[in-house]
């Protein structure tokens, strides 16, 4: 939000100088990002009129001007500006004036004496982009100091607003906070009722319920289309970052900046009536003010004329009903549109307007009648005309009601640790525009309709300390002995998880907890979504149900930047909708990884090959080994996984995640042209671990036996391993798959697996007969359960 310092002081009559004002704004939460000082050194610069212009005899680029500054004689000025012409009113720097580092002196240019300098706005520090001489209105008083005429010096102040302070998107909204912080009060603002002169009106129909509960308007006939924007208004707009366009448009912008209510003006002669507000219909088309024709879906709020769209409510007007240079009859609109009805619609069309910026965050629902009256008064004063009566249509049941809150003295003292005098509490709250009624235990406070962010007692206490100053809160060191908790040995902490994954050459990624609904649709994760009511953007409108979509998107961006070997992991929360109506979403911590490219960094001692399922499975198993979690892997049917190259991950008889190669169809839609291997698991089962116990090493030798078996293709290695462990029990120290073969000598539908078993007893040496008995049991079990044949 950018505004003029002088404009703010008109609403908040404070004595503080500019430096104190800037510091105060930041201290009360309205962070100042930039201050552009305007017109501090305009001595000896006057308003002048060019009386005569003749070409310079020695230069095609210079003109000789005779200039009137209300002195006895005309001044001769040599000028090279492209827009110099007789009758033009411009700023003139007299001899001795300073413009930046330049002091104006009498000089001779190509043999012609010049006794001053005609100035551009850029040279005077009043604009950053202007070219040519600064053109002033024809009625500007000649000989008047420019600083007096333009109400200078001034400053253009730009502040950064948090989303909850939509009320400060107006000069008057900011003034309430500044006045309260500086022990002052805002200047009263009242517009007298304007009597109707014209009988012309338009019927209004509201068909959008809570999306548009209030609509105000006024018809004004017979305005002067050639009336210029007065310099005081044009300068306030410029210093607020808005370029003047035409009087009617400038008045709507001016009212928006001063009061905070976006407005729109229609050429009433292009309207038939009735005016309506409704949701758009699929495939409705509308030509916008920027010249584009857009096709709408059924999710836009539109203003209609005879049920035909003429504007996108809260966004932008339509081409057919626009104000032109010949408009003499106008219909002013000021309405209250709900933030949810405007939010994200502009981004769908690539639009961002001052109106949508305000409506998305919330506009005072009580403002429309006041804004119409103010704009009507300005038009009558500056362009004449005959006003009609105020049109005011509303749906009271949908209008938000101001919060009425009990503020207790005891609660203030408990939260802040200090006692604030009753008089100070009442002064601050009343200066902020709140209605305050004294009660036995404190005050009954009604928040102003512009303050959507005030709903509970703590909000009021925050206002007190914000305006009074956080520096007045007591500073106290913690009392009592500090307690340093030892890390639990039954849990693997997050630092250890990160270190383990980093040791496996994975790099940590931190993504938003929000994600694009369209991306989830591609992953077939578009059920049970947790939608945000006020998203940062349309692309970040859903709380992520899994880490992988965002993580793989980050991997894709790295690939697009010519990185071939990418290894990423992320630790974060995921969100799913609760089965209970009205309950908070379920929040679970997950760990995920995604890799692509070569298995190893390029070096002479390693064979070059692509990373595969088993590489990432090894990374996952190393993480599980750190906590002692026992993982098993079963074939998966997840839609984003490659069939045959992905698995569900189980721990303690519960499916906790997925690992595998992404489905080629998915990577193609994500515009990733390499194989991506990934996993994602719930973190809680991985970080739980039993209390570590020490075991003595066996004094007796181990025995290794190998089995070569032919196994049906559908039988997985994990199923075989589980059977072997069940049969052997505690004597089995390890079981490994060390070879897999498919091809000549193995019939179709089968595979050959070579298994190594390590057997050991802690109490005695295993003899051949013991081992043979065990191996016989293993062979019988796998033959019966899995239709396995032993190879000789």
Curated annotation (Swiss-Prot):
Residues 39-147 form the tRNA-binding domain. Residues 698-791 form the FDX-ACB domain. One of its GO terms (biological process) is phenylalanyl-tRNA aminoacylation. Its cofactor is Mg(2+). InterPro entries: aa-tRNA-synth_II/BPL/LPL, B3/B4_tRNA-bd, DNA-bd_dom_put_sf, Fdx_antiC-bd, Fdx_antiC-bd_sf, NA-bd_OB-fold, Phe-tRNA-ligase_IIc_bsu, Phe-tRNA-ligase_IIc_bsu_bact. Disulfide bonds: none annotated. The lineage of its organism: Bacteria, Pseudomonadati, Pseudomonadota, Gammaproteobacteria, Lysobacterales. One of its GO terms (cellular component) is phenylalanine-tRNA ligase complex. SUPFAM superfamilies: Anticodon-binding domain of PheRS, Class II aaRS and biotin synthetases, Nucleic acid-binding proteins, PheT/TilS domain, Putative DNA-binding domain. Its EC number is 6.1.1.20. The gene is pheT. This is Phenylalanine--tRNA ligase beta subunit. It holds the Pfam family B3_4. Belongs to the phenylalanyl-tRNA synthetase beta subunit family. Type 1 subfamily. Tetramer of two alpha and two beta subunits. PROSITE patterns: B5, FDX_ACB, TRBD.
